[in-house]
Swiss-Prot record:
Signal peptide stretch: none
Subcellular location(s) of the protein: Membrane; Cytoplasm
GN (gene name): Plekhb1
Gene3D superfamilies named among the record's database cross-references: Pleckstrin-homology domain (PH domain)/Phosphotyrosine-binding domain (PTB) (2.30.29.30)
Single Gene Ontology MF annotation: protein homodimerization activity
Organism name: Mus musculus (Mouse)
Protein name per Swiss-Prot or TrEMBL: Pleckstrin homology domain-containing family B member 1
């Protein structure tokens, strides 16, 4: 007895999807939750109790996936969907409203009423039937999501270096000499040609200041000294009144 010839999978189902994992698939209209616009998507109900919708029947580009298993409160069909309008040119008989336990709703529209009833039956079975062991379902990582690369740059103010170009002309020696601005700064002298002075033989000075050095302390000391001086002068002005 010759072995049975394997049945080729449905042409719609492509690798890595397996026919055994798909419960029901077909085209449905879906209403967006924000703009309330209708869009036609390919829907696939998988054995793990999830409902995914895609750009086309190849099920390669997944827009999103909704958990159906133990998450459906009720499903309305046709004229029962009073709070939603069908897509332009479609009949109200094909409407489906899936009320989820988490509070959200999924508004769909099938081609015919019979198709809508078939989808309702499949969704209700997926809601109450546990997924069989070994069922192969496409991973959710195949969703179509914007690829955003986040780059984090660490910044430390103590690592910032500010360069100041300083030159002082000495009339006695007839050349430019370097004078350090403050004692807490380190001065490095380098002789080369370049900006900001392009004259020949100009000596440039690069001053590396400590950006963590706070100028608030000298300012506070100056204000304190000024206040003490003012108080002393005030007491001297009123001193003749004591005699």
């Amino acid at each position: 007895m010759s072995p049975a010839t394997p049945v080729p999978p449905d042409s719609i189902l492509e690798s890595p999807f397996e026919e055994m994992a798909l419960v029901r698939g077909g085209w449905l209209w879906r209403q967006s939750s924000i703009l309330r616009r209708w869009k036609r998507n390919w829907f696939a109900l998988w054995l793990d109790g999830t409902l995914g919708y895609y750009h086309d029947e190849t099920a390669q580009d997944e827009e999103d996936r909704v958990v159906i298993h133990f998450n459906v409160r009720d499903i309305k069909v046709g004229q029962e969907c009073q709070d939603v309008q069908p897509p332009e040119g479609r009949s109200r008989d094909g409407l489906l409203t899936v009320n989820l336990r988490e509070g959200s709703r999924l508004h769909l529209c099938a081609e015919t009423r019979d198709d809508a009833i078939a989808w309702k039956t499949a969704l209700m079975e997926a809601n109450s039937t546990p997924a069989p062991a070994g069922a192969t379902v496409p991973p959710r990582s195949r969703r179509v999501c914007p690829k955003v690369r986040c780059t984090t740059l660490s910044w430390n103010p103590c690592k910032v270096e500010r360069r100041i170009w300083v030159r002082v002309y000495s009339p006695y020696q007839d050349y430019y000499e370097v004078v350090p601005p403050n004692a807490h700064e380190a001065t490095y002298v380098r002789s080369y040609y370049g900006p900001p002075y392009a004259g020949p033989g100009v000596t440039h000075v690069i001053v590396r200041e400590d950006p963590c050095y706070s100028s608030g302390a000298p300012l506070a000391m100056g204000m304190l000294a000024g206040a003490a001086t003012g108080a002393a002068l005030g007491s001297l002005m009123w001193s003749p009144c004591w005699f």
